[in-house]
Amino acid sequence: MCSSDLPAPVTALLSGVLAKAGAYGLLRFAILLLPDAAHRFAPILIALGLVAVIYAAIIALAQTDMKQVIAWSSYSHMGIVAVGLFTLNAEGIDGALFQMLAHGIVIAGLFFSLGMLALRTGTRELAGFGGAANTMPKLALLAMLFAMAGIG
C-alpha cells in the first residue's frame, strides 16, 4: 500500500514523524557512534542527498495528485536533511535538526489540509481545486500558508 492510498491522518503521521526517525537514527548512531565511517562516507551521502533533492523535486512537478506532490516534496526535503547532517559540522547539523522540526510540522499540516480539501471537493487532483478559495476561503488560506511554509 502506497502512502497515497492511506487516509490523511496516517499519511501525516508517517511523513511528519516517522520519516524523521531515520534521520535521527543517522545522527544518533551513524554520526555520533561511528564518526570515522561518517567522515569516510560523508561525500557519498551528501551527493545522494543532493540527488534526492533534485530528483524528488522533478518528480513532484510531474504529479497531478496533490498527495503525490506533497509526498515527493517531502522526499526532497529529507534530502536537504541528509546533506545537512553529513556536512559534519555544527551549523549543518543544527540546520538539519531545524529542517526536521519545521518539515514535520509543515508536512503534517499540508496532509491534513489536503485531506479536508479532498473531502470537500471530492478529488485530490490539482485541477479539481480550482475555485476552492471562493467556496472555502479559510481552508484555502490555511492550505496556502502550509504550502508556502513548505516552499521555504
Report each predicted region and the residues it spans.
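Hydrophobic transmembrane alpha-helices and their helix-loop junctions in integral membrane proteins
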Residues: S4-G152
